[in-house]
Amino acid sequence: MAALQSPKTSSRRSKGDGDGDTRDVILGKYTKIEEIGRGSFATVYQGIHNKYRSCVAIKAVNISSLNPKLKDNLKLEIEILKGLQHPHIVALIDCDESTSCIHLVMEYCALGDLSLFIRKRDTLSKHELTRDMIAKYPNPPAGGLNEVIVRHFLKQLASALQFLRTKDLIHRDLKPQNLLLNPPPSTYAKGLLRIVPYKTREDSFTPLVGVESLPMLKIADFGFARSLPATSLAETLCGSPLYMAPEILRYEKYDAKADLWSVGTVLFEMVVGKSPFRAGNHVDLLRKIEQGEDNIRFPIQTEASPPLKKLIRSLLKRNPVERLSFKDFFESSVVKGNIPGLVDEDLQAQRERDSRLAAHAARRDSLPSRTSDGKLEDRPPSSASSPRPPPSNFTRPATSPAVRHVGSRENPDLQRVAVKARKASVASVTGSPSKEELRDHNAKGPVTEQPGPTSPAKERATTRKNSSDQRIDDILDSERERAAQDVAFERDYVVVEKRAVEVNAFADELAASPRFQQQQQQQLIPKQAGAIVRRATTTATPQLSSSPRDAMSRAVATAYNRPRTGSTHNRHNSYDRRYGPSPTSATSAISKALNKASGRLFGVSFSPPLALTKAGRSPPIGYNAFPAYPLAEGNLAVVGDGAKIQPPLDEDTKVLHIIEEIATRSDVVYGFAEVKYKQLAPLTPSMQADTAIKPVVSPEVVDTPEANDTGLTVDAIFTLSEEALVLYVKALSLLAKSMDIAGAWWARKNRGETIGNSPNVNVGCRVNNVVQWVRNRFNEVLQKAEYSRLKLLDAQRQLPYDHAHHASQVGRVSVGALAHSSDQVVISSGITAEKLMYDRALEMSRTAAINELTGEDLPGCEIAYMTAIRMLEAVLDSDEDHQLSGERAGEAANTVSNEENGEVNGLQGEDREIVAKLVASIRIRLTALKKKIALMTKRTSAPAMVSPARTPACQPPAASPVVPQASSR
């Protein structure tokens, strides 16, 4: 809130000026002095223009997580924003790029933001820059700001929004923190600031509307969220949802009217002193908005006029259709009319300014002006609140070739959600006559034109007219193409973004539930191993969070080479059950089974064998495949022998078991994908010695020759990448399905429906634990899927043009939503997750059967059988079952489709029958193996271990399992 810090000291600070490490940094024409703010993606510093000795704000945007294409798109957007010159919008002055940051030089606003202004309302009378304002317009004893100040800020905010509407732009993140304040122009004349802000124009700090003696409002942070990764909808949801429109909170498509809701919330906070709806997360916020039913109540002590309250209520309508339109908002008496309650001094100044503006408008109306095509026209008079025209060098986003990269195939941002409202009509964009008007004009022209010889001047005029028509046609075609691209772009990417946000939002809601928190606290008393902590950063390195913003922003080019040995105990200490005699033996055995089967798929090696590699092993050291998700007691009934009669379960417990079953299947698929992934991003020799190291592959290192020198050929990298990608996508679908079932269960709980009389009070807590695990795993898989996609694209570019797997060749299919990214992702024909999983399960069951016959590693055989069953259950799992809930979803995953010839997830009816028979045969083998192990354990005096050499003597060998052959799909 303090005005300026540097004027009290020197404009340049020496190295030994008390701040130790704090030093001035010269950035071209500017000097960065000290930090004045910090956000999610950037740090704001106060700076000085070296030549003019005026203040600027330098915003350092961290670009370490951006690949080169995203950097180029950001630069293009910045160049466009330089043309948005308006007194009530913080101007982008300059841009300077370093190796790790892009420094955005912007106008400096000395009074901070509006949220700080409201919070410090009681101390404004003591500040030298606001003392006179409070003396004239004191704030009410209770509530927010004086209504004169509120209306003054509203007029300036409306002026900026009206300017943005002429450009078909929406801000999408209006909130008090993004509304910056500058002292009135009289402050500089009085010399209260020794260093004045840098001006991009003479009228940069001259208000268009409002009272000249009051602070000047400017909209900040406009447009940058559209270009930065993992922003837009996702960042806003995670950042400050208090000012978001309900249609955004409902994940619906929204238009420019979302800004009007934000204006209503900001206006309410200025009047009352707090936001109209307050909640801990956006789920509770939406619930409060819906429960309010558009009944906006003001505290009794609020000093606000009825017109102002009416305007706020008309803006805070849940339904965008019922919400006040922009036209009515700009024409409302509160925005357009005079401000009541002005003191005589300001009232006289207001009248003088209105007279000057009226005289200026009259002179301007008397002069003709030229349109963009060279014709003369008369401009209508503009009101005092109308925005000033942009400078002649302003680059229109709608017609700039650079902007056409947004939403096109050249834009590589996978996670962006296109939410900017654009119009295909070019009339409002360019100010030129529309195509229909030109046709009418051309049709009427020959009627009034007298025949005669064509003069050179007339020929030039005709040429200009034809060129203008051609230019209009080109602009219209460009706009249509761009609109189509944006529609396709939003349709393709909003699914991934929305799903990631929904998963994290539901996990947040469940973790914040008081009933679950109380149960978890009760569990911590008798047991040291408590529940999973909300937002536990188990999916990546400790410095990264698992929020949707971080997960999506780093998914573009970040992957994590981390062993999971050390993380197994920390992640799953909520569960008691683990397969095998110890956690390490189970994971070791199943890892061995996965590794042995990795080179024998389909008769050829889809996972590259050692012959394809220059060095290294497959898979690398440090991989623990299973079980990363241990089940609770009693959940082995699905894979058991069926002879053990289970007690009847209540509905809550059934839902819990179904959720855990699907989550376990997803973990098996994840473990299979990890075998591929670990070969794409192997551990370095120094990291293999210490399995606790979790290296992070930065986006800039991914494309370097050193990072790609993994000992794999290009063909091997291509095969591994596409196999890992389809497996990760399958794991994501299973994780989403388990979350959908949990969400349906939770919704019925909140509606008060009696689902079941569960004798186990910990069922809800266990569901919460599963949901938190699924959330963390979902974010991790999303990151690794994006890394696999980038590796696949890189391998495609390195393949020869005539190679069968080159992107230009035919016979390829896409991989769902991921394939519609700007860098087209294509998967080789015949490569599906279901086929990979089927062959892997088949290979594992065969290997386990051989080991069982020879008496080798019987506990490992048991785990291999169970893993194969889980993987085949995942093959039978249908994406169409996602809408099912409760027991129906679990049954759908374990039964064959009734449609004999119908195709589900690429599997024909006969193929599903083969898979079901294979599951049944493996279950029989598992039952026999369990009986054998139980008998051996009973006969031995040492229950810990039985020598493999004595195994055949203790139990006669079982018959070889009947394993059906894979069908040609």
From Swiss-Prot:
Family (UniProt): Belongs to the protein kinase superfamily. Ser/Thr protein kinase family. APG1/unc-51/ULK1 subfamily.
Q: Give coiled-coil spans as residue ranges.
A: none
Report biased composition (Low complexity) as residue ranges. 960-969
Q: Which UniProt keywords apply?
A: ATP-binding, Autophagy, Cytoplasm, Kinase, Membrane, Nucleotide-binding, Protein transport, Serine/threonine-protein kinase, Transferase, Transport
What is the protein's major site of localization?
Answer: cytoplasm
> GO CC annotation: what is one?
cytosol
Superkingdom is Eukaryota
What Pfam families does its record include? ATG1-like_MIT1, ATG1-like_MIT2, Pkinase
Report residue spans for region: Disordered.
Answer: 1-23, 351-471, 563-587, 880-907, 941-969
Q: EC top class, in one word? A: transferase
Q: Where in the cell is it found?
A: Cytoplasm; Preautophagosomal structure membrane
Membrane topology designation:
Peripheral membrane protein
In terms of PANTHER family, this protein maps to: NON-SPECIFIC SERINE_THREONINE PROTEIN KINASE (PTHR24348:SF22), SERINE/THREONINE-PROTEIN KINASE UNC-51-RELATED (PTHR24348)
What does the entry give for GO biological process? autophagosome assembly; autophagy of mitochondrion; piecemeal microautophagy of the nucleus; protein transport; regulation of autophagy; response to starvation; reticulophagy
User: What is the protein named?
Assistant: Serine/threonine-protein kinase ATG1
User: Which parts of the sequence bind ATP?
Assistant: 36-44, 59
| Reaction(s) this enzyme catalyzes, per UniProt | L-seryl-[protein] + ATP = O-phospho-L-seryl-[protein] + ADP + H(+); L-threonyl-[protein] + ATP = O-phospho-L-threonyl-[protein] + ADP + H(+)
Its source organism is Coccidioides immitis (strain RS) (Valley fever fungus)
The cross-references to SUPFAM superfamilies, in alphabetical order and at most eight, read: Protein kinase-like (PK-like) (SSF56112)
Q: Residue spans with biased composition (Basic and acidic residues)?
A: 14-23, 351-380, 434-443, 457-471, 881-890
Subunit info here reads: Homodimer. Forms a ternary complex with ATG13 and ATG17.
